[in-house]
Curated annotation (Swiss-Prot):
Protein name, as recorded: CCA-adding enzyme
Annotated EC: 2.7.7.72
GO function terms (MF aspect): ATP binding; CCA tRNA nucleotidyltransferase activity; magnesium ion binding; tRNA binding
Binding-site residues, Mg(2+): D41, D43
Membership in a protein family: Belongs to the tRNA nucleotidyltransferase/poly(A) polymerase family. Bacterial CCA-adding enzyme type 3 subfamily.
Coiled coil regions, renumbered to chain: none
Length: 400
């Protein structure tokens, strides 16, 4: 199972070997192959230096030359090829002060984070496992390569990566490894929020998120991270996979706060999505009629509302009041969405300029209120979305 990507990349290994160097598949792709999981990306490790890789292949991109990584472009696909390397002491709990190249596979593998990620495989699917990674896979255990405290001291992100693997793979964190996490957890404050968010997005969607989330709480992880440290995270529960945006919206709703999302350094689209989810969670329980539901679907979008309904159990776990299932059911929501006369204010056959012309009034907050009322009346079928009818509505309802 899952040999196709390896076979596609096999000629790269063969070409490196033809020039007298070693080359292996390594890391997550090998781990997932051994677990019969879907394989996303292929990483290659080699005894050849970046200069030697660039001389072997016609098309390369030096994406991380200083760290030994060259992108080899083969048949339209990019493959990261990294030289066997060892690392000097780490600085700032996140990066080595120096990287130097070696010619020994075992020396390269021993610098990696967890035993399940320190397994290599050659072009013929022979496994090279010096640190009992396969044993850990069979026992469903997350365990560091070598001394756990040293691994986490080198790069504190490995703590979060370990919890992320626990969530994604449904594994258990080995006892000494978890104790080392506790010992080094304060080092998390040295990490960039961007690196943390990348890992949290994967962790929160994992099949074993409930245990990983409890471990995050137990480790006091959130006390060391901007945005989260201002929230009472011990109040929150996540017992099933959820998107990052939904999770953050739950935190805001539980805390009854509008804490700024700027500390998370996420995209504007993600911020917008979180704020929409947050408003839906707050306002949903107040919707008590089909007419109100129609406006709600128009304002927030069918898909966003369905996203919230799908996590009702998580909302209840967090003592967030859920919407009435008699009103908020998939059939009603889809039916309303299908028959909405307009989907945005832009679809109204009247605009602010039209209203100003027939009222001879100056623009102001009143104009926005009038347009909103027109939206409501069109959506509730009190007036058709026809220009003449809408102009007539303005003359009858707006004092000139």
């Amino acid at each position: 199972m899952g040999t196709e990507l390896f076979n596609q990349a096999k000629p790269i290994l063969e070409k490196i070997e033809q020039h007298g160097f070693e080359a292996y598949f390594v890391g997550g792709s090998v781990r997932d192959y051994l677990m019969n999981r879907h394989i996303h990306d292929i990483d290659i490790t080699t005894s050849a230096t970046p200069d030697e890789i660039e001389s072997i292949f016609e098309k390369t991109i030096p994406i991380g030359r200083e760290h030994g990584t060259i992108n080899v472009v083969y048949q339209g696909t990019n493959y990261e090829v990294t030289t066997f390397r060892a690392e000097a002491e780490y600085v700032d709990h996140r990066r080595p002060s120096e990287v130097y190249f070696v010619r020994d596979l075992k020396e390269d593998l021993q610098r990696r984070d967890f035993t399940i990620n320190a397994i290599a495989m050659d072009k013929n699917f022979n496994i090279y496992d010096y640190f009992e990674g396969d044993v850990a896979l069979n026992q469903h255990i997350i365990k560091t390569v070598g001394d756990a405290k040293e691994r986490f001291k080198e790069d504190a992100l490995r703590i979060l990566r370990g919890l992320r693997f626990q969530s994604q793979l449904n594994f258990t964190i080995e006892g000494d490894t978890f104790e080392a996490m506790k010992h080094q957890i304060a080092d998390v404050e040295h990490l960039s929020i961007e690196r943390i968010v990348v890992e949290l997005k994967k962790l929160i969607k994992g099949q074993n998120v409930s245990q990983s989330y409890l471990n995050l709480i137990d480790l006091n992880f959130f006390n060391y991270v901007p945005f989260f440290r201002s929230l009472d995270m011990k109040q929150t529960k996540v017992n099933s996979p959820i998107s990052f945006e939904l999770w953050i919206a739950i935190l805001l709703t539980v805390e009854q706060t509008n804490t700024s999302l700027s500390d998370l350094k996420i995209s504007n689209n993600e911020k917008t999505k979180i704020n929409q989810y947050h408003k839906i969670m707050i306002e949903m329980p107040q919707v008590s009629s089909k007419e109100q539901l129609k406006l709600f679907v128009y304002d927030y979008g069918m898909n966003n509302i369905i996203d919230i309904i799908a996590i009702n159990s998580i909302l209840e776990d967090n003592n967030i009041k859920i919407a009435s299932p008699l009103i908020f059911n998939l059939q009603s929501i889809k039916e309303i969405d299908q028959h909405l006369p307009i989907r945005s204010r832009r679809e109204l056959n009247i605009n602010g300029g039209d209203i100003l012309r027939i009222t001879s009034k100056k623009s102001g907050p009143w104009l926005k209120e009038v347009l909103r009322q027109i939206e409501i009346d069109v959506l509730t079928n009190k007036v058709p979305n026809l220009k003449d009818e809408l102009l007539k509505w303005v003359k009858e309802n707006v004092k000139i």
